[in-house]
């Protein structure tokens, strides 16, 4: 009897940080993709920044959220990791239990990479979670007027047009490198997904790690950018979708993105609570002529999810499109059953 053939799971690497990454990862987990998440380590605000300063550990917040998005634990157990101490706890105020656990395990293991792998095993993570680098990074911004600032949490507050960002090591001026596992995942992927997330403070901090950025440029995988729905205060005022892509290409010195996903569903002006989501400005405008000059393929559709007075990418719709792309690009080979 002949062996039947089946299509293997697509190997998808998702690179970013912030709140956008978990939305896509949950969808990929539900579709049973072979997923690897590469998470930014340049955050220096909130609980992550405080622990980074006091305990000298890689910022934990984005890593925590990514681990939870791929975890098979019950929601009750996930809530424990997300619990934040209230303001009455003084020193612990604002810290989540998950961040404290990550900091403690990094100290115990002597390595943030090893700590994440152990925690992923404990949490039943379905996939791989890697920090973009195995050390905390400092994000620097150079603005159009030539002024500079360092620190991820400070960049948007300057409220000037950003010309360029780059990263340096927290301790000294040694060259920042990604781990071997990150580079192998990128080179072995069927698809590399960038975003969604803050352009200058969630996506580019990863790509500005020299060997990581070069791996994304060199990979034979389909490189997909998920364009943001809204512009962001202090980062992308007045940006069109093609402006987002142009910035990525200029930073890496090459047009490396193969496909851009763009939401075309209208966001009503009175829907978004701009007090609750104070980083939002207006919906990203479309420039399809500009996009066609930047990338070979643009996919525009309704990828919108209205929730809690805010607008988000619908993870299920986005992932359906990613899977269609993965199989249509002929990068998924047949494997024996």
Language model segments and positions:
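Non-transmembrane, aqueous-exposed alpha-helical and coiled segments at domain scale
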Residues: 2-14, 29, 33-37, 124, ...
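C-terminal functional extensions of proteins
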Residues: 238-337
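Short glycine/serine/threonine-rich phosphate/pyrophosphate-binding segments
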Residues: 20-25, 201-208
């Amino acid at each position: 009897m002949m062996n039947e053939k089946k299509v293997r799971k697509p190997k998808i690497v998702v690179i970013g940080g912030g709140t956008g990454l978990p939305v896509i990862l949950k969808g990929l987990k539900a579709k049973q993709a072979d997923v690897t998440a590469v998470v930014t380590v340049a955050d220096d605000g909130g609980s992550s920044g405080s622990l980074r300063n006091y305990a000298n550990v890689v910022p934990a917040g984005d890593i925590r959220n990514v681990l939870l998005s791929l975890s098979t634990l019950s929601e009750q157990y996930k809530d424990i990791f997300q619990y934040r101490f209230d303001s009455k706890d003084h020193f612990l105020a604002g810290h989540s239990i998950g961040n404290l656990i990550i900091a403690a395990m990094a100290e115990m293991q002597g390595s943030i990479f090893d700590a994440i792998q152990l925690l992923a095993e404990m949490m039943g993570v379905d996939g791989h979670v890697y920090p973009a680098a195995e050390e905390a990074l400092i994000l620097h911004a150079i603005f159009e007027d030539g002024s500079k600032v360092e620190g991820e949490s400070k960049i948007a507050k300057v409220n000037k047009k950003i010309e360029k960002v780059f990263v340096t090591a927290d301790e000294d001026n040694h060259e920042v490198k990604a781990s071997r596992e990150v580079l192998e995942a990128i080179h072995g992927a069927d698809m590399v997904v960038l975003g969604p997330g803050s352009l200058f403070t969630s996506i580019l901090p990863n790509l500005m790690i020299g060997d990581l950025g070069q791996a994304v440029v060199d990979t034979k995988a389909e490189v997909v950018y998920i364009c943001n729905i809204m512009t962001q205060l202090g980062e992308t005022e007045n940006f069109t979708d093609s402006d987002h892509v142009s910035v990525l290409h200029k930073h890496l010195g090459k047009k490396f993105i193969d496909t851009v996903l763009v939401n075309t569903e209208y966001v009503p002006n009175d829907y978004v609570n701009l007090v609750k989501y104070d980083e939002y400005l207006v919906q990203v405008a479309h420039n399809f002529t500009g996009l066609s000059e930047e990338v070979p393929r643009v996919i525009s559709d309704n990828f919108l999810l209205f929730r809690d007075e805010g607008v988000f990418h619908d993870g299920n719709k986005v992932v359906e499109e990613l899977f269609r792309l993965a199989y249509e690009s002929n990068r998924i080979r047949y494997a024996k059953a």
